[in-house]
Each structure stands twice: as structure tokens, then as C-alpha cells.
Amino acid sequence: MTLLLAGDIGGTKTILQLVETSDSQGLHTIYQESYHSADFPDLVPIVQQFLIKANTPIPEKACFAIAGPIVKNTAKLTNLAWFLDTERLQQELGIPHIYLINDFAAVGYGISGLQKQDLHPLQVGKPQPETPIGIIGAGTGLGQGFLIKQGNNYQVFPSEGGHADFAPRNEIEFQLLKYLLDKHDIQRISVERVVSGMGIVAIYQFLRDRKFAAESPDIAQIVRTWEQEAGQEEKSVDPGAAIGTAALEKRDRLSEQTLQLFIEAYGAEAGNLALKLLPYGGLYIAGGIAPKILPLIQNSGFLLNFTQKGRMRPLLEEIPVYIILNPQVGLIGAALCAARL
């Protein structure tokens, strides 16, 4: 029996989990807590407080999924003034083995720990063992990556595919591209500027400014407040969530049009990734947005745009596509990584 510590470390929230592992029973969660990251100057006091409350021995191994790049076993969180160093963490926490992993890579590792109820199949396809697995996930940004089978395990390879160019396919998407280029006074638009939480807001602003439909007063006020708070780290409103809810409830035509365009672009980019990887092991849709707008994804052309790749369409129709419903998939991945240390 080995005691492990897994963590999902974000700019807003830090979730820690103690896990026991054994050869016969796999992983078993024994304690979990969530903390507001900004309340602490560093990860160390959070872990120390967590272990005192858990009242267990010091874990033998730990893996922390970090919202930011990992460089030479160090990490600077994207939205938090923390600098994490593996060697320092090991010394100050007394944990012999600590590993830092990118949060989207942790999602990749977590896929193997998901249960049937954690997934919603969008397309059954024709799964093929030993073939790549693809991951794409719109949230704050747009994560992309893939998994390759190595022995009895999978190796995860994150990428920066979300920063590839946005490729418009029809007149309205060309108009959107021109709008974003002019608005930001830049030479190129990454697909992340369209397929992400901020992308939802950008699409709404485009449709609003081009008079595609009238604004409803409540959504208009939320978006205006967000625009006025530009540059502030802490926002008082979440317009992406408000637009998504209004579209789901069919109470705001502009929000419905926004989500329609967003989902079409999301499906098209997922199809682009699938063409590059041919992930017959499955393409997994991660991130916080997809589960919240699942009815819209099912009915608003995601799969149509995913497979709409000319003569390559038959290939894409055979790729299994799943939406990950479990919001703790990254934490599961961190625990599985710790077990492999």
C-alpha cells in the first residue's frame, strides 16, 4: 500500500487529493479538499494545511497538475504569482518524489482512469486498439494533445495547437476573422481566440456590432460590465457562461447565434486535429465548456463540421468521439502519474 498526493493547481482553485494504491485494487481516494489559490502565497502552506487536516503520514509520491508550462521541473502559474520548483517542494514538504505536469497533459493521463458514466459518446465510430488518442478542450484557452500506447501505458504529448491559425470556411467566418484582425490590430488570429471561453464573448461582440440580432438587456449589461473591466485580473461577471445559459434556455437570439457559430468552429477544429492524428483510439472533448452546453453540441452541427472534410469524411466518421463529463479528470491524471513515479 502506497500513499500518494495528487493536485490540480489553478489560478483560481487548488484541489488536493490523497490516494492509496495497491497492486490488487488500483487507486482509492481517502481524502480531498479544495482551496482558493489566491488566499495563499505559495503551494507549500496549502499542502501543509491539507496534510495536517488529513491526519495521515507524509505521502511517498506527489504529482501536481499545473495551469501553465513546465520548464526543467519548474512552473510559473499563468494566472497566479507562484513559482514552483520540484526540488524546493520536495525539501519543504518532505515528500521524496514530486512531479509537475501541465494541466492538459494531466487530462490526457486521466482518460485511462475514467468510467463509462464519465463520458458522453457523440460518435461511436470504429475504435481501433493501439492507435493514437486525441484530446481537445476549450475552456479559458484551447488545449490540444495526443496519447500514444507504450507498453501497457499511454504516453501523453501536449501541444500548442490552439495557437495555430483560425481558418475561416464561409462568409460569416471570414467576416469574423476580419473583425478580430481589425479590433486587435494584429496580423493573424489563432483558433484559440474563437474556440474558447473568450472566443464565445468575441463571437457575441462580432454579431452584436454587425447587427445580426438585437441584444437582450440582461446579457447586454453583463457583456458591457465585462468590457469595462478589461485589464482587471478579477472580473465580477462571466459573460461566456451567461451567453451559454441564455442560448440553452432559448431566451436570447444573439446568444443562440453566438453558440451556433462557436460550436461549428469547435467541431471544425476538432476535425482538423483528427485529420492530423487519425485517433481511432478516440477523440476526447475536454475542458469546462462542452459538458455545460452538451444539448447544443448534440444539436448544433458539431459532428457535421467535424466530419465535413471533403473526401476524408469517411475516415472521420469512423473515429470515436467522446465528451468528458467528469470535471476532475485532471486530478485523476495527476494521481495516475504519481502512481507511475
From Swiss-Prot:
Keywords: ATP-binding, Cytoplasm, Glycolysis, Kinase, Nucleotide-binding, Transferase. Its EC number is 2.7.1.2. GO terms for molecular function: ATP binding; D-glucose binding; glucokinase activity. InterPro entries: ATPase_NBD (IPR043129), Glucokinase (IPR003836). GO terms for biological process: glycolytic process. The keyword Repressor does not apply. ATP binds at residues 7-12. It is an enzyme of class 2 (transferase). Pfam families: Glucokinase. It comes from the Bacteria. One of its GO terms (cellular component) is cytoplasm. It catalyses: D-glucose + ATP = D-glucose 6-phosphate + ADP + H(+). It is found in: Cytoplasm. The keyword Cytoplasm applies. CDD domains: ASKHA_NBD_GLK (cd24008). Transmembrane segments: none annotated. Belongs to the bacterial glucokinase family. HAMAP family: Glucokinase. This is Glucokinase. It comes from Nostoc punctiforme (strain ATCC 29133 / PCC 73102).
